[in-house]
Amino acid sequence: MGARNSVLRGKKADELEKVRLRPGGKKKYRLKHIVWAANELDKFGLAESLLESKEGCQKILRVLDPLVPTGSENLKSLFNTVCVIWCLHAEEKVKDTEEAKKLAQRHLVAETGTAEKMPNTSRPTAPPSGKRGNYPVQQAGGNYVHVPLSPRTLNAWVKLVEEKKFGAEVVPGFQALSEGCTPYDINQMLNCVGDHQAAMQIIREIINEEAADWDSQHPIPGPLPAGQLRDPRGSDIAGTTSTVDEQIQWMYRPQNPVPVGNIYRRWIQIGLQKCVRKYNPTNILDIKQGPKEPFQSYVDRFYKSLRAEQTDPAVKNWMTQTLLIQNANPDCKLVLKGLGMNPTLEEMLTACQGVGGPGQKARLMAEALKEAMGPSPIPFAAAQQRKAIRYWNCGKEGHSARQCRAPRRQGCWKCGKPGHIMANCPERQAGFFRVGPTGKEASQLPRDPSPSGADTNSTSGRSSSGTVGEIYAAREKAEGAEGETIQRGDGGLAAPRAERDTSQRGDRGLAAPQFSLWKRPVVTAYIEDQPVEVLLDTGADDSIVAGIELGDNYTPKIVGGIGGFINTKEYKNVEIKVLNKRVRATIMTGDTPINIFGRNILTALGMSLNLPVAKIEPIKVTLKPGKDGPRLKQWPLTKEKIEALKEICEKMEKEGQLEEAPPTNPYNTPTFAIKKKDKNKWRMLIDFRELNKVTQDFTEIQLGIPHPAGLAKKKRISILDVGDAYFSIPLHEDFRQYTAFTLPAVNNMEPGKRYIYKVLPQGWKGSPAIFQYTMRQVLEPFRKANPDVILIQYMDDILIASDRTGLEHDKVVLQLKELLNGLGFSTPDEKFQKDPPFQWMGCELWPTKWKLQKLQLPQKDIWTVNDIQKLVGVLNWAAQIYSGIKTKHLCRLIRGKMTLTEEVQWTELAEAELEENKIILSQEQEGYYYQEEKELEATIQKSQGHQWTYKIHQEEKILKVGKYAKIKNTHTNGVRLLAQVVQKIGKEALVIWGRIPKFHLPVERETWEQWWDNYWQVTWIPEWDFVSTPPLVRLTFNLVGDPIPGAETFYTDGSCNRQSKEGKAGYVTDRGKDKVKVLEQTTNQQAELEVFRMALADSGPKVNIIVDSQYVMGIVAGQPTESENRIVNQIIEEMIKKEAVYVAWVPAHKGIGGNQEVDHLVSQGIRQVLFLEKIEPAQEEHEKYHSIIKELTHKFGIPLLVARQIVNSCAQCQQKGEAIHGQVNAEIGVWQMDYTHLEGKIIIVAVHVASGFIEAEVIPQESGRQTALFLLKLASRWPITHLHTDNGPNFTSQEVKMVAWWVGIEQSFGVPYNPQSQGVVEAMNHHLKNQISRIREQANTIETIVLMAVHCMNFKRRGGIGDMTPAERLINMITTEQEIQFLQRKNSNFKNFQVYYREGRDQLWKGPGELLWKGEGAVIVKVGTDIKVVPRRKAKIIRDYGGRQELDSSPHLEGAREDGEMACPCQVPEIQNKRPRGGALCSPPQGGMGMVDLQQGNIPTTRKKSSRNTGILEPNTRKRMALLSCSKINLVYRKVLDRCYPRLCRHPNT
């Protein structure tokens, strides 16, 4: 600002204000034009300091002069302004701009010796030789040279796009910045725009269309002579197939130049215009002024939309003259029509100031009221005759402002002076000081007649004073919270801009200087470098100070105020510095009781009086889809609670937090009340559990509480509490209905009163998230305005810390309180903490330290599970600052499934641990605050019993401490636990301080690296240092990584029978020793551990042990130092004694074990594992060639697990992880289909998903018919049930759908180029093209080579599932599917049958067993886990009709024999085994066979009549019955049968 004020000083500034803007015009230059010119210079990379001298102006003119002929209006205005400033520096007297422009150009011509010529419009503009402007193509030595675009130009383009977001300003901005550019430069500009890819795509499409049109209009000519430059194609103009040199040659060749740069610019402009229309869809015909919208705001919207309209200037001019007036509101339209034909925009803005706004309405209302009922201020006014109404604008009588047709006069309606409107007229305000009539003539402008004849500027009462006061009061009442903006007096043109800037800065919160009114706004000002304390007074018209001397150049004035008149000296054009701004204004000096800056200086400073109106927008909340609100009944309440709830609800209703629910609201949630902590007041609670279930989900924005150790050290701390935090934030109006609740009445004396919440309710799941989000939005401006202040907010607690002085800190706190209070939040004084100690988050804060609030451990005689949980919680809370706290044995007291009220039995270890914790808590500990400049360190110590403690500190000051006692594994060691502790501390430090501390670990580096080399995958470990703090973490035994030469090798195995719990553990050695131990009540894992212990116990100091149990291998490899398992502890003791132990794992080697087969092999002395000798060659093979797993298993015959272990052990082949891929349907009938293109041909590709088999061929066109024919051909060759494609028009055509329907194919569609939808065929397209490229030279046509490539891919590509080719795999899958279906059909015939059988000479029937297979001579039966083969002659097959039931239900019945006969019940084993010795077999009765329908649970009584009158039942019933005729049947059966069928089952021996 200082540079701009120093451009013109003294007489030069006065001379500037005499120069007219146009010849014969009224307007003259002002200082604001210099400010504008200084701002514009920055766009051209020119310093504004050049305006301060004649030589600097000459440099500016040399740069701008070549650009003027093709420049924008802004550039021409800047050139004209610099010409005027140059003339003033050169002391050339000029009257207007044109005269100054001629003088400056004449000087430039004389200086350069020749005038610049206009460039030819048919080719791109370029600067003349020797001149270097902002042109990418310049002429040097007769040749055109390309100069890359400057970073300033590119930065200006990117900034333009980012700020305007493809608004209407982007197109002219691009025109200006791309002037003279080549296509290469334009592409460089487009590539700089990174985030607006949608708009860039639109531009690319326009470029492609225009390039195609260019190619069609400019066909390629015949062959060109050697050396002749070709004509540009569309892609050449776009810069994709041409070089920069070619582009320059086309642009500047002597004959037939082609301005490729300008052509490409036009294409880009078309694309930008399309983007502008897309991003600004409002049509200019829709831009209409609102009924209360200021005219200036309407004009801004109109011209913004006008810029986006891509029409010629004539149409835009018509729109400006016609639409601007036509779409104005009625009030402004009436004023604009009175201005006559074609008024200027400045005249329209001036005439419509204040029209239609609340201020004008209030003024008209006040005038009407005054004329209708207001008494005259003159005592004798009633005796005088009232004159007719005279309108001041035209001077005619008989009408008011609304009916006047004359053009409005410019200037103030009150005093007639230009430069301000009546709303800001100094004579209209009741100022504190007024200028007296000394030496001043009365204004000659027309005014309302003064009955008293007194001068209107005198201090006595004037006729309009009452009217003005009432109008001002009405305006104040109407405008309410609208801010009063004090405007300049320099022509009136800065006022609209000031108003607009004020409105635009409204969302910046506290970024601008503000003065709250809790005290008088007094600032220090420097008047001509003399410091003065002044009061900022918006009620005073003028400024007056005392005690300074400003010289003799003054005018005497008399001003009147509350205390009377005082004599003053008025000084004009005085330099004043206040609030880091410099202005020049008029000031008076005199004997005033207080120094005052009035509106004349406040306006120059750009200050305004604002009343912020706070409003928190509610966040929209909905229920989950398909859910409805709660409809629960209110449960009964006591009279005391009902009265308490009634009082609470009435208070909340008065405060606007509740409102009465309408009778149409169907929802309800139960409410109740509980006593607060003080037991005197009640708290209302709503049971929102049901509403929470159906409310949409929320995310907690603040995931944890802030820790005091993370606070930076500050001198001042204050803590605010937001009272009724939730109740200060509105609930969305559409959601309020679901919060309805009812207050019942005692004995139902009256209907219950129903309420709904208008604010966030307590207990509702959305309240915390919405409150956290809202508070963040509220406090964000404050944080930005006060970056040196730490503001920590957690729910309703706010901590403010700073290094400011006490007074400045209190100001910030008060400012925050006012901000919160203005938004409707309360900050209760009783909860405001100003002095330490501060109670915050369970801690006590001091300026230099923090500590926990006093902890009190509970004292109880009987402890329950809940009491222990609370005790452990208190101790864990204390562990953040009290080092040494342990809870391991306390937690063991409540291990297992226990109820909260169950009594706990204390152990001696737990009691000792509690007493130790009490001693630790008795010594008060303190923590310190974080200092960012110091290093953060963490020291870890190991306590007893695998418990760890750590402290995080800076130098010797401890920030916080902690403990760790979590053991994730039963068998572990100290190094693994140490890694877990470090990981916990690292995460904690990242959360609290955002950085990783430097660790001091109690472990030797050699010990750590020995373990870490093999177990680096365990976790992440940051930088650390060794610290000698006993007890050190050590590894207790020496595991080596390579086999020990010469040491005995033990091969171990163990097994166990799950039913009998008996097992065996045994080993063999390479030296012929073996040992087997029988175990009882064991498990497989215990047997494996036992044999490992046996091998250690029976071996020498060095040993190689081979195991087949990953369980054992995992325990031993972890090098545990302690375990809860007895055998593992014995293993640890044995391994400590060894010098070296090598342990290796091989999968499930046979020959050793505890089962029957392995025990037999051990007894025979077969000790070899057959594939062990091939492991070493396989490892060598992999080390040489890094073979894959499949190759190792195929070549060396080793198991897949061994091969995978070899590959995973290789550092080069080790994979840290794999990407997570999507899954596709791989059923046997699923195919995927897609199109691909190669050498201009269309190839249709179909892939069998499960096998990778491919079908492809070249088709003439990409249409639905061709696709349908190919699909029909494919379906005739292979079974296809499902076809998956993209959703292209050819695949969704009717032809393809018809073929799919006819063949019976299910279609599904995905998204094009989405790898998770049709990724198989997309990948196959790529492989097909690669295969074609390998064999392309073997055929001429693309049709042939495609079929050849398909053959290679189907029959020569082995691998994958089954190690087959895709063709073999597909045929195998189809064959397998057929076999499976056949076997399933066969097996389904046996699943409902059971088999009873005999074995050997045993005559007892056994079973039943499950029938697996029935052959010609035998059947296969499954009994339990055994599978038996039984001859047909010793087996009885019966049908199973269901499981065994009670006797009165359906028992198991016999099924039909194979030859159609029914099996006799006496042959059923369960019956036959109960037959008495020597009993005869049953025989059918003579009178016929009786059948019993036991499956249905009843015995039929109806029989079919026959000629013999026999009791034969229905034929259908016989299929479900069993023949009952035997000598001995259960008594229950006998009773039933004897009663219903007396002739059934009679036997001579019965």
UniProtKB/Swiss-Prot annotation:
Entry annotated with the keyword Zinc-finger: yes
Single GO term (MF): RNA-DNA hybrid ribonuclease activity
Zinc finger (Integrase-type): 1173-1214
Lipid moiety-binding region (N-myristoyl glycine): 2
Residues the entry annotates as binding Mg(2+) 1: 721, 796-797
ZnF (CCHC-type) intervals: 389-406, 410-427
Motif range (Tryptophan repeat motif): 1008-1024
EC nos: 3.4.23.47, 2.7.7.49, 2.7.7.7, 3.1.26.13
Residues involved in Mg(2+) 3 binding: 1234, 1286, 1322
Domain of life: Viruses
Entry GO terms, CC: host cell; host cell nucleus; host cell plasma membrane; host multivesicular body; membrane; viral nucleocapsid; virion membrane
Keyword flag NADP: no
Site (Cleavage): 135-136, 365-366, 382-383, 431-432, 445-446, 512-513, 611-612, 1050-1051, 1170-1171
Positions of region (Disordered): 110-136, 437-508
Swiss-Prot/TrEMBL keywords: AIDS, Aspartyl protease, Capsid protein, DNA integration, DNA recombination, DNA-binding, DNA-directed DNA polymerase, Endonuclease, Eukaryotic host gene expression shutoff by virus, Eukaryotic host translation shutoff by virus, Host cell membrane, Host cytoplasm, Host endosome, Host gene expression shutoff by virus, Host membrane, Host nucleus, Host-virus interaction, Hydrolase, Lipid-binding, Lipoprotein, Magnesium, Membrane, Metal-binding, Multifunctional enzyme, Myristate, Nuclease, Nucleotidyltransferase, Phosphoprotein, Protease, Repeat, RNA-binding, RNA-directed DNA polymerase, Transferase, Viral genome integration, Viral nucleoprotein, Viral penetration into host nucleus, Viral release from host cell, Virion, Virion maturation, Virus entry into host cell, Zinc, Zinc-finger
All copies of domain RNase H type-1, residue ranges: 1044-1167
Compositionally biased intervals (Basic and acidic residues): 497-508
Catalytic activity: Endopeptidase for which the P1 residue is preferably hydrophobic; Endohydrolysis of RNA in RNA/DNA hybrids. Three different cleavage modes: 1. sequence-specific internal cleavage of RNA. Human immunodeficiency virus type 1 and Moloney murine leukemia virus enzymes prefer to cleave the RNA strand one nucleotide away from the RNA-DNA junction. 2. RNA 5'-end directed cleavage 13-19 nucleotides from the RNA end. 3. DNA 3'-end directed cleavage 15-20 nucleotides away from the primer terminus; 3'-end directed exonucleolytic cleavage of viral RNA-DNA hybrid; DNA(n) + a 2'-deoxyribonucleoside 5'-triphosphate = DNA(n+1) + diphosphate
Modified residues (Phosphotyrosine): 135
Record: active site: 537
Cofactor(s) of this protein: Mg(2+)
Activity regulation remarks: Protease: The viral protease is inhibited by many synthetic protease inhibitors (PIs), such as amprenavir, atazanavir, indinavir, loprinavir, nelfinavir, ritonavir and saquinavir. Use of protease inhibitors in tritherapy regimens permit more ambitious therapeutic strategies. Reverse transcriptase/ribonuclease H: RT can be inhibited either by nucleoside RT inhibitors (NRTIs) or by non nucleoside RT inhibitors (NNRTIs).
More info: This isolate is from a German AIDS patient (with predominantly neurological complications) who was probably infected in Mali. The reverse transcriptase is an error-prone enzyme that lacks a proof-reading function. High mutations rate is a direct consequence of this characteristic. RT also displays frequent template switching leading to high recombination rate. Recombination mostly occurs between homologous regions of the two copackaged RNA genomes. If these two RNA molecules derive from different viral strains, reverse transcription will give rise to highly recombinated proviral DNAs.
PANTHER family in the cross-refs: ENDOGENOUS RETROVIRUS GROUP K MEMBER POL PROTEIN (PTHR41694), RNA-DIRECTED DNA POLYMERASE-RELATED (PTHR41694:SF3)
Name of the protein in question: Gag-Pol polyprotein
Species assigned in the record: Human immunodeficiency virus type 2 subtype A (isolate BEN) (HIV-2)
